[in-house]
Regions:
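Membrane-proximal helix-turn-helix segments that form the acceptor-binding/catalytic region
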Residues: 24-44
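Nucleotide-sugar-dependent
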Residues: 107, 159-187
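Acidic anion/phosphate-binding donor-loop and adjacent secondary structure
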Residues: 56, 67, 71-87, 108
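Active-site proximal beta-strand in glycosyltransferases
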Residues: 1-15
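Conserved donor-binding/catalytic core segment of Leloir-type glycosyltransferases
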Residues: 72, 86-107, 112-117, 128
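Alpha-helix capping/helix-boundary segments
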Residues: 50-52, 135
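Nucleotide-activated donor-binding/catalytic signature segment of Leloir-type glycosyltransferases, i.e.
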Residues: 128-131, 137-164
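Carbohydrate-associated surface elements
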Residues: 50, 68-71, 157
Length: 187
């Protein structure tokens, strides 16, 4: 049976960039584990062509690498499927900046919160955060401590099928990652 690995994140680089470790025994062990996986699989599929360099630094895997980009499901391309009324009551009135993703370390919520603070006096600018993750409680706490409750709204997690119904209410969609070279390879 042939086996293929579809690489969505580069390890251990992504773990390091998220602030979990930069070197040491665990980092070296992760590197060896990743090298072992790359050696054992028949093919390595990458979602970003920029991933090749990192993978090739771990060994001679050029013959195994294939580029297979991420795609969007049809529900994101068929406007007739959108129900504008579905989430209307949850979305505040105003200019909506929407973030819909993992609420984690790599997403750089410190910068998002700084931006929300800078726009706090503009009451018509609303920051809507859709998702869940390790930093959700931190973000909720910061929204309260920084007195951002009138402009920052955390809606929680929703299934993929609901995303177009949420996105239709956004004036701007926000994509945020820490300023680390490894993360620039995925966008």
């Amino acid at each position: 049976i042939r086996s293929y690995l579809w690489v969505q994140d580069l390890w251990p680089e992504s773990v390091s960039a998220a602030g979990k470790m930069n070197s040491g025994l665990v980092y070296r062990m992760l590197t060896k584990m990743v090298q072992s996986i790359y050696q054992k699989v028949d093919g390595i599929c990458i979602q970003s062509e920029a991933f090749s360099q990192s993978i090739l630094q771990k060994g001679d895997y050029k013959h195994k690498i294939s580029y297979i980009p991420n795609w969007a499901e049809d529900l994101f391309t068929d406007d007739s499927l959108i129900n504008k009324e579905h989430f209307k009551s949850l979305i505040p009135d105003g200019f909506v900046v929407m973030f819909a993703c993992n609420i984690g370390v790599a997403q750089d919520f410190d910068s998002i919160l700084k931006a929300a603070i800078r726009t706090k006096e503009y009451k018509d600018i609303k920051w809507v955060i859709v998702g869940d993750g390790r930093k959700k409680e931190f973000v909720e706490q910061q929204v309260k401590e920084l007195n951002l409750c009138d402009t920052v709204f955390l809606l929680g997690r929703y299934p993929l099928e609901d995303m177009p119904d949420l996105f239709i209410h956004a004036d701007v969609m926000l994509v945020s990652l820490k300023d680390q070279n490894i993360f620039s390879l995925t966008i």
